[in-house]
Swiss-Prot record:
The keyword Cytoplasm applies. The modification N-acetylmethionine is found at residue 1. It is an enzyme of class 3 (hydrolase). It comes from Mus musculus. Pfam families: Peptidase_S9 (PF00326), Peptidase_S9_N (PF02897). This is Prolyl endopeptidase. Transmembrane segments: none annotated. One of its GO terms (molecular function) is metallocarboxypeptidase activity. The active site is at 554 (charge relay system), 641 (charge relay system), 680 (charge relay system). Belongs to the peptidase S9A family. PROSITE patterns: PRO_ENDOPEP_SER. Cleaves peptide bonds on the C-terminal side of prolyl residues within peptides that are up to approximately 30 amino acids long. Keywords: Acetylation, Cytoplasm, Hydrolase, Protease, Serine protease. GO terms for cellular component: cytoplasm; cytosol; extracellular region; nucleus.
Length: 710
């Protein structure tokens, strides 16, 4: 007796592709066309089962009500100074998009400068990137619709917040860098393409160009400053040096933390910017990352991982740039990772380190590199910073699993450099004193110690009875640091849950070594690390397999899907958000080609063999043992996700329902929800965020029989 009547879905058994002598069947390749009537009918049929299932979850209403109540707290960014004014972002609580405010002084009256909520009825137009001119008098800002990566750039005169007529289109993954004369701005665009470009298409993004837009002119007159016709995957972002004299061009080939660095001395362009710039190729290989910090004349300070996987600061003199002449300003730390650096008050450097997944903030001397001060911080993450070379003050924002945020302000002109609390936010209804956060280090399959944070109510019995929510990512050198999540705290508070975040390999938690330990031929380490996290939680009595949910998004969606295939017995519930599921074809759609630096590419025989072993789409099989079924699975994606296109999740759910869902022993649901007017996640309006987490936690509660605790 089938527990679920899944839709009858056509299988094209003739759809076969050959890879290096292997014939791979791809019966749902027709779902790769997002515009076909068949695909639309498939999505509609899936949503028709999923939406009622989610709406009938007994706690969905309670969860959504509580989420709406607790998420309604003020959310601030750090203040930042532009020209003679201060700006900051602020959301009163439940506004769909945060609003940009301006003040003439820190004590002055705050006025709305840009409110994205006025740009759509449903909050689906979001601010994506912005840049002020050097004098703070002009403002460029990017808008994206429905969660797409495509951006339209518009301009304003800051005085009186006056709209200007300039509009830039065909923009994606862009820099925004004004020349210091305020005449114009560098940005990136893509060539015209056939068909639509609204975020629902899947066509590949190649041949990005660097252009210069002169304020007050039409985009058709913009000046092409750099292009790479022989290297279609290259992407080059520009920035201006602090003194405005040099344009620095960072060229990236994929997602690896390595870039070429070219520069142009604008004093060598006597007629201004009129065409391809006279680029000097300072670094012309992909052997390290070079992140500009500041310069004193021709001596440039960079943060680099060249021969230093945890990063260090070096000085390169542009007049004598040979690598043998580079000077170390701040050496690499043996264990801690240097995450970012900023120059402030002309001669100070602010350095942010990651020490066992917790941030450390320091002040150093620009001339000698010497440590001057370590700023006091609780255990958690620095999530905001402002302060540039010409500023004499800094703001920084701290958060943790149990603290929504404190913003500190430090006046660097004072003798005593004491940061003061500038703003502190509390959330009514969740008392941090009732909960505890611990960090443990558990052994993975190969013995490597992996850090994991665990958050739970104080005083719980470790008897294996608690529902647990385990989150992971594990890729692209991205570190998953403590963050404040109301939706997860509701799970802890009202569902009696344990929250766990595993800092598995592939991330940047311990520098480039940690990243390389979870990519390419080592990708299986990510899955092993995550499965060992689950086993640790079970062994220590936090939870049991039937009470354990795993969750991840994007590369983390791949993670949880691969783990469900490899160890269906270990988890009770899996929620995969916008996951990469077809590892043989991902590089063919939108920006997927950039991820080959982490995954490899099936066009190469050796890579194909790695990918085929774990690709979620190609490893779905009915468990052999009678008493093992797949966990309850909910896939989430959206029609305007042009980062990880929805076809990944569509093909995966069709495969799951066909191979597993038709079996008598599979009583757990295998469902997908496809949202509309939404994308990969950036800029998602609050209303949609609340609906999404209500769906997720209602699904968990229904599938794992979790009662709501008032």
């Amino acid at each position: 007796m089938l527990s679920f009547q899944y839709p009858d879905v056509y299988r094209d058994e003739t759809s076969v592709q050959e890879y290096h002598g292997h014939k791979i069947c791809d019966p749902y390749s027709w779902l790769e066309d997002p515009d076909s009537e068949q695909t639309k009918a498939f999505v509609e049929a899936q949503n028709k089962i999923t939406v009622p299932f989610l709406e009938q979850c007994p706690i969905r209403g309670l969860y959504k009500e509580r989420m709406t109540e607790l998420y309604d707290y003020p959310k601030y960014s750090c203040h930042f100074k532009k020209g003679k004014r201060y700006f900051y972002f602020y959301n009163t609580g439940l506004q769909n998009q945060r609003v940009l405010y301006v003040q003439d002084s820190l004590e002055g009256e705050a006025r709305v400068f840009l409110d994205p909520n006025t740009l759509s009825d449903d909050g689906t137009v979001a601010l994506r990137g912005y840049a002020f001119s050097e004098d703070g008098e002009y403002f460029a800002y990017g808008l994206s619709a429905s969660g797409s990566d495509w951006v339209t750039i518009k301009f304003m005169k800051v005085d009186g917040a006056k709209e200007l007529p300039d509009v830039l289109e065909r923009v994606k993954f862009t820099c925004m860098a004004w020349t210091h004369d305020g005449k114009g701005m560098f940005y990136n665009s893509y060539p015209q393409q056939d068909g639509k470009s609204d975020g629902t298409e899947t066509s590949t993004n190649l041949h990005q160009k660097l252009c210069y837009h002169v304020l007050g002119t039409d985009q058709s007159e913009d000046i092409l400053c750099a292009e790479f016709p022989d290297e279609p995957k290259w992407m080059g972002g520009a920035e201006l040096s602090d003194d405005g004299r040099y344009v620095l061009l960072s060229i990236w080939e994929g997602c690896d933390p390595v870039n070429r660095l070219w520069y142009c001395d604008l004093q060598q362009e006597p007629n201004g910017i009129t065409g391809i710039l006279k680029w000097v190729k300072l670094i012309d290989n992909f052997e390290g990352e070079y992140d500009y910090v500041t310069n004193e004349g021709t001596v440039f300070t960079f943060k680099t991982n060249r021969n230093s996987p945890n990063y260090r600061l070096i000085n390169i003199d542009f007049t004598d740039p040979d690598e043998s002449k580079w000077k170390v300003l701040v050496p690499e730390h043996e264990k801690d990772v240097l995450e970012w650096v900023a120059c402030v008050r002309s001669n100070f450097l602010v350095l942010c380190y990651l020490h066992d997944v917790k941030n450390i903030l320091q002040l150093h001397d620009l001339t000698t590199g010497a440590l001057l001060k370590t700023f006091p911080l609780d255990v958690g993450s620095v999530v905001g910073y402002s302060g540039r070379k010409k500023d004499s003050e800094i703001f920084y924002q701290f958060t943790s699993f149990l603290s929504p945020g404190v913003i500190y302000h430090c006046d660097l002109t004072k003798e005593e450099l004491e940061p003061m609390v500038f703003r502190e936010v509390t959330v009514k209804g969740i008392d941090a004193a009732d909960y505890q956060t611990i960090q443990i280090f558990y052994p993975s399959k190969d013995g490597t110690k992996i850090p994991m944070f665990i958050v739970h109510k104080k005083g719980i019995k470790l008897d294996g009875s608690h529902p647990a929510f385990l989150y992971g990512y594990g890729g692209f050198n991205i570190s998953i640091t403590p963050n404040y999540s109301v939706s997860r705290l509701i799970f802890v508070r009202h569902m009696g849950g344990v929250l766990a975040v595993a800092n598995i390999r592939g991330g940047g938690e311990y520098g480039e070594t940690w990243h390389k330990g979870g990519i390419l031929a080592n990708k299986q380490n990510c899955f092993d690390d995550f499965q060992c996290a689950a086993e640790y939680l079970i062994k220590e009595g936090y939870t049991s397999p039937k009470r354990l949910t795993i969750n991840g998004g994007s590369n983390g969606g791949l993670l949880v899907a691969a783990c469900a295939n490899q160890r269906p017995d270990l988890f009770g519930c899996v929620i995969a958000q916008v996951g990469v599921m077809d590892m043989l074809k991902f590089h063919k759609f939108t920006i997927g080609h950039a991820w080959t630096t982490d995954y490899g590419c099936s066009d190469t025989k050796q890579h194909f063999e790695w990918l085929l072993k774990y690709s979620p789409l190609h490893n779905v099989k009915l468990p052999e043992a009678d008493d093992i079924q797949y966990p309850s699975m909910l896939l989430l994606t959206a029609d305007h996700d042009d980062r990880v296109v929805p076809l990944h999740s569509l093909k995966f759910i069709a495969t799951l329902q066909y191979i597993v869902g038709r079996s008598r022993k599979q009583s757990n649901p295998l469902l997908i929800h496809v949202d509309t007017k939404a994308g990969h996640g950036a800029g998602k309006p609050t209303a949609k965020v609340i609906e999404e987490v209500s769906d997720m936690f209602a699904f968990i509660a229904r599938c794992l029989n979790i009662e709501w605790i008032q």
